[in-house]
């Protein structure tokens, strides 16, 4: 047993220039874990609370000194002397101490940073890479897979300052046989997309997640540009590369009139009409995954969408499920969607994150591990994806170090497992619900 001997919280800066919480957990023997909480832009209303100070004189009110204070005081006092490898116990102590349904006393940003730092310190104390330790916590020791990247190469919605309503247009390099090859394909398409956009006189500045953020006439235009880029890179769309979208529909859903208002296109849709709009895009392009294709509270709309599209493509719940097992359980019972997006700051601890992944898999749903639009150099989600054999990862485009850090960690893990004589499989499109 390696006891926790020191806990340190600090305010650091994320990829959007906003503060976030970093935690250090020290164990006996000199083992240290360091982790930082990410932050979202388009957030589900039922997510665990990210505690901000609200002091307009610092960081426009976005400081996290209250959350940092919770780490350095109440949380530290509660877990000092505890066994660092008792992950579930440590997480439960923090959850109970917070005492709220949504972690609003200390902030999910405080609790998560300590939770992840504890896991990293415990992994170090056991001489294990983080992905291997996560697999042990998951009850699946030695079971790994390399995730299929869903690479966000055109950004819209809340992630970009442009007129594109759909938040993410992604490529899936399904023709690859390894993770590293998938990243090469993604990079080549990304660079060719820059050329395509420039040739059309369009902006090649990037959004929060490293994808391009041009003004386009329609969402279909974004898909057409990506198709051209895939072909210019020498690949076949639908065979080597498939497509995915994150609609983030809650961001353009008008609760007053019940319409999905796509201002960039000047179009409005009822819930069912929007499902058929997406169906039309799927018929025109090889779109294999759609995330949040309805408003988070439009469960009737999601049920209809699942009936229409759920047998053909992956329907991922992000704002819909917010990595919460209570909400996911209800969704499974009602046949809503067929996949869950996993963002550990939506729920606020590693233990609860692993529970959501397990519940999804047990129900035949897929689990897509995801970054947030506000990130740091912390690459824990790469280890989470491999250690749970989740099969898919969303961590942005082929630019911005906060995104590429995760891809580079995946390269290291793939290389290490191969060198140990236990290569992790890369299953490509087979990992996507409905595509096996």
Swiss-Prot record:
One of its GO terms (molecular function) is phosphopyruvate hydratase activity. (2R)-2-phosphoglycerate binds at residues 167, 343, 372-373, 394. Binds a second Mg(2+) ion via substrate during catalysis. The keyword Glycosyltransferase does not apply. Keywords: Cytoplasm, Glycolysis, Lyase, Magnesium, Metal-binding, Secreted. Its main location: cytoplasm. Belongs to the enolase family. Component of the RNA degradosome, a multiprotein complex involved in RNA processing and mRNA degradation. This is Enolase. It comes from Actinobacillus pleuropneumoniae serotype 5b (strain L20).
